[in-house]
Amino acid sequence: MNIQFNFNQKTGRIKPMHGVGQPPFLGIDYSYFSYLKEAAVPFARLHDVGGAYGGGRFVDIPNIFRDFNADETDPASYDFAFTDTLVSALMDYGCPPIFRLGVTIENQCYIRAYHIHPPKDFGKWARICEHIIRHYNEGWANGFHFGIVYWEIWNEPDNGLPGENQMWTGTDEEYFALYDVTAKHLKKCFGSSIKVGGFASSGFYSIFNEPLKFGVPEKASSNELSEEMREYAKSPRAKHMLTFFFAFFDYMKQHGSPIDFFSWHSYDSVAEVEQIADFVDRCLCDFGFGHLETQLNEWNNAPKKELRGTSFASANAAAMMCAMQNKKTDILCYYDARIGQSVYGGLFNPITYKPFCTYYAFAAFGELYRLGSQAGVSGAQQGVYALAAADAGKHAALIANISEKDAVLSTNLSPAMKGFLLDQEHFLTETDQNPASFVLKQNQVILLKNF
């Protein structure tokens, strides 16, 4: 396979494809945020950061505004203590939050749901959100002037049929109304100084059940995870997610609800996510919302305990970021960067607290992100993803091989470029491979740069 790079051709900016969710911290030890800074991670989405049932301390509305009957205009009604430490640390390390206004998932809600009910007064809930924003952006209640841009209204209200949803016990229509009331109030208060959006869609897996109807391939890839997702796509839960999506934007149009960005989630493979991104963009254009920013702000294409810290995980993460750079999607946030025993926590070893190889896929992308301008690439195919960036005389390229075999590659890269290999045995280890001709093994990544 011959891959050609043109560092004189500028095709746009390198987008923030290497954001994360659940930033890495232990207790209130935020020193692990240094890893985010080293990788130039651009955003940390604040959802599920509070621990089980919100943990009682961080971010969630019930953790900040503990008594819903209290006066929402009184600073004494708010408990910003722990959330202040978290948000301040993120800002200190140069990683602003995407602030989710809502609650943490309640995984065992079938026993009892605590905070995932619709607020009993949507207008008051919107005013509570207003004062949280004023605290972090306007200094209200001994607050800050952080200029946080992205404010997301709730998370995955579509995640399950009524009675089964771990995020939202209300009806679809109740969420639409909550979004409408809150978005209108926040935009009235803050105008263009903030961006308001949602609804953090749980996913679009079911479109592959009717490929002709939705304009997608019957099967974009065939790895084990994609096969599992195809089975999941047949479930009533997955079908409800799609119905919710169409109904949400129909409501937005009918009610003139303001929305600056649409957020969605996926745990599918790279090839499927590429197709989903195109589907989302087509739908938004059809709805009359083609101008919206879009965020894939919860994704993980190796969410299994046996895949954490493997070459498969790091290569697929790098491939996802390279692939989505070439889609319309504006921001990606990987789920997640926590330090803990979770199948989703793919960046850090929960025993040693050290980075897994997958973290270095984000660090490698960060090298291109710092350069700023995307450069021309041609010739990558068949499960090999390539991306390039340039800044004046500085050049860098990233290649990920997630195909079913080793890739024999030739390029027009100068032999003077240094190569750094990434897999579960090499954490961006410098290699003596000739950049003009080399073999990139299955599930390997290489970063090449001249600086």
Identify the role of each PLM range.
Residues 1-35, 39:
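Mature N-terminal, pre-catalytic/accessory segment of carbohydrate-active enzymes
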Residues 24-36, 238-254, 312-321:
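Short, acidic/polar
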Residues 431-451:
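C-terminal beta-strand-rich structural cap/linker in extracellular carbohydrate-active enzymes
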Residues 253-307, 330:
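Glycoside hydrolase catalytic-domain groove-lining segments
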Residues 39-259, 265, 269:
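Substrate-binding cleft and catalytic face of glycoside hydrolase catalytic domains
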Residues 380-415, 422-425, 443-444:
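Carbohydrate-binding surface patches
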Residues 297-369, 373-385:
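Aromatic/acidic polysaccharide-binding cleft in carbohydrate-active enzymes
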Residues 20, 90, 132, 151, ...:
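Conserved, mostly hydrophobic/aromatic
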